[in-house]
């Protein structure tokens, strides 16, 4: 029996909900999700539905952040917190601050309409551990109303050691710490001040205290079996080379994942780095650094989430769920989320088979080169996005070593109102520099021609296929080997 497609076009409509239920019924019993070979089953069970901790999960599951923690105890040179901003896509920004009660109401509304939702996080817009009373109250109330949702926090780590035991008691089993240095001499270039022990600290003293508290918190989390992801901002000329040492240190202290993110530096954001002209890294610089890191598993699918982000990574739906749109009284209905999970279990089983076949194909090539391939996707692990509608492209390296996600390239949407913008296309061509081939479900003649002139081949030939199946078949065609039988896509 063929696998039903995961529909996403009418995401909040009754038709979509009904289709999910019908699809879930049609697939019957679902096979269990299998842990990858490099992850133990216990860890896999915790991360398999968390879109930030599992690259595979981000194709299928959504996260939600609630902006209940505006207070912060450090100042970073790359941060300018904003609490009523709808236009910027970066950490520390939210459209509206919430009380714990408002947050619970919003979480129920989202859970009822977004069946992909699996995780609730508190990531500010300040610091979740420093603004602890609001964080704790929110988690306690959400856990009572929606007991099957996973809880996680993001923190700078300064106040983390004070609350690790409480996090464990509340079954918070995923924590992200932003660690940009393990040498206070580097830290003084990133943090003007911290607030700790009832007073403000500056200079080397501030960086030293922050470092010591971050390391203590990381060790305490590891001792209690709480999974930790470390975020690091790559700041060219400040900590880029130093992040190699950061990677080694955080692995030794128990971090599961390391996510190296590019500095977002724009004057209009009002950050110190933005106003002083500190540049962010180019895409190739970020990838080159990531490729040099050894130790923890790397997260390469980060989206720089806002403090009020909602939805699949790369598809923020926060604007659909403002407080004004949510009823004062609302009851949780688990049926959509339960049906969706049944559907996804079957889809993931088929996807895993296709992924393994594709990797066997490319690794069987005796003489083959390396390809850098961009993919337009809107979820489900498939090539299912029109070139003109894409706001980002997933980038994969394909070689005899296998198929690996290398990162993503952000772009402006080319096609608006049915027409493409020439200036936007020029920027897309620049953003895709170094890419050999682009895969999408549809592309117009003009953008295809412009990409070809820039040395980039675009093709619709693998539309709606699993990404890895398409990459394997494409690699086989490029290097003259027999590809596996094509996996059914509908």
UniProtKB/Swiss-Prot annotation:
Pfam families: Nitro_FeMo-Co, Radical_SAM. Binds 3 [4Fe-4S] clusters per monomer. One cluster is coordinated with 3 cysteines and an exchangeable S-adenosyl-L-methionine. The two others probably act as substrate. S-adenosyl-L-methionine binds at residues 78, 126, 178. Its EC number is 4.-.-.-. GO terms for biological process: nitrogen fixation. InterPro entries: Aldolase_TIM, Di-Nase_FeMo-co_biosynth, DiNase_FeMo-co_biosyn_sf, MoaA_NifB_PqqE_Fe-S-bd_CS, Nase_CF_NifB, NifB_C, rSAM. Keywords: 4Fe-4S, Iron, Iron-sulfur, Lyase, Metal-binding, Nitrogen fixation, Plasmid, S-adenosyl-L-methionine. Pathway: Cofactor biosynthesis; Fe-Mo cofactor biosynthesis. CDD domains: NifB (cd00852), Radical_SAM (cd01335). [4Fe-4S] cluster 2 binds at residues 302, 305. [4Fe-4S] cluster 1 binds at residues 72, 76, 79. PROSITE patterns: MOAA_NIFB_PQQE, RADICAL_SAM. Its cofactor is [4Fe-4S] cluster. Residues 58-308 form the Radical SAM core domain. The keyword 4Fe-4S applies. One of its GO terms (molecular function) is metal ion binding. Involved in the biosynthesis of the iron-molybdenum cofactor (FeMo-co or M-cluster) found in the dinitrogenase enzyme of the nitrogenase complex in nitrogen-fixing microorganisms. NifB catalyzes the crucial step of radical SAM-dependent carbide insertion that occurs concomitant with the insertion of a 9th sulfur and the rearrangement/coupling of two [4Fe-4S] clusters into a [8Fe-9S-C] cluster, the precursor to the M-cluster. Belongs to the radical SAM superfamily. NifB family. This is FeMo cofactor biosynthesis protein NifB. The lineage of its organism: Bacteria, Pseudomonadati, Pseudomonadota, Alphaproteobacteria, Hyphomicrobiales.
């Amino acid at each position: 029996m063929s696998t039903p497609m995961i529909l996403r076009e009418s995401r909040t409509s009754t038709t979509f909900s009904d289709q999910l239920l019908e699809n879930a019924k049609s697939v019957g019993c679902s096979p269990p999700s299998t842990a990858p070979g490099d992850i133990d089953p216990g860890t896999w069970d915790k991360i398999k539905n968390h879109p930030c901790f599992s690259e595979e999960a981000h194709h299928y599951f959504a996260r939600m952040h609630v902006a209940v923690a505006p207070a912060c105890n450090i100042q970073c040179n790359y941060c300018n917190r904003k609490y009523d901003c709808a236009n910027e896509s970066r950490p520390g920004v939210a459209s509206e601050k919430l009380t714990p009660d408002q947050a619970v109401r919003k979480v129920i509304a989202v859970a009822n309409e977004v069946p992909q939702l699996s995780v609730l996080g508190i990531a500010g817009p300040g610091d979740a551990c420093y603004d602890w009373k609001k964080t704790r109250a929110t988690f306690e109330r959400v856990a009572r109303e929606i007991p099957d949702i996973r809880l996680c926090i993001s923190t700078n780590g300064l106040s983390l050691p004070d609350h690790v035991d409480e996090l464990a008691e509340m079954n918070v089993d995923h924590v992200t710490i932003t660690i940009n240095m393990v040498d206070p001499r580097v830290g003084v270039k990133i943090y003007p001040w911290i607030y700790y022990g009832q007073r403000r600290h500056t200079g080397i003293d501030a960086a030293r205290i922050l470092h010591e508290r971050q390391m203590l918190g990381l060790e305490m989390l590891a001792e209690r079996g709480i999974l930790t992801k470390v975020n690091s901002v790559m700041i060219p000329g400040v900590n880029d080379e130093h992040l190699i040492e950061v990677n080694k240190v955080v692995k030794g202290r128990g971090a599961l994942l390391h996510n190296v993110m590019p500095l977002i530096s724009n004057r209009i954001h009002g950050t110190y780095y933005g106003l002083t002209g500190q540049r962010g890294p180019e895409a190739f610089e970020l990838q080159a650094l990531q490729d040099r890191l050894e130790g923890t598993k790397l997260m390469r699918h980060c989206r720089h989430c806002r403090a009020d982000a909602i939805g699949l990574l790369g598809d923020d739906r926060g604007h659909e769920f403002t407080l004004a749109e949510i009823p004062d009284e609302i009851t949780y209905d688990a049926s959509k989320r339960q049906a969706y999970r049944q559907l996804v279990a079957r889809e993931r089983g088929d996807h895993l088979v296709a992924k393994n076949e594709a990797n066997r194909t490319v690794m069987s090539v005796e003489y083959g080169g390396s390809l850098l391939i961009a993919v337009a996707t809107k979820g489900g692990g498939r090539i299912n996005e029109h070139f003109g509608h894409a706001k980002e492209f997933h980038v994969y390296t394909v070689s005899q070593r296998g198929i690996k996600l290398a990162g993503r390239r952000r772009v402006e949407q080319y096609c608006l109102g049915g027409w493409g913008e020439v200036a936007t296309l020029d920027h897309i061509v620049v953003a895709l520099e170094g890419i050999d081939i682009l895969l999408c479900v549809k592309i117009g003649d003009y953008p295809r021609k412009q990409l070809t002139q820039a040395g980039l081949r675009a093709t619709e030939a693998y539309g709606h296929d699993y990404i890895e199946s398409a990459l394997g078949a494409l690699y086989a065609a490029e290097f003259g080997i027999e590809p596996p039988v094509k996996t059914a896509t509908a």
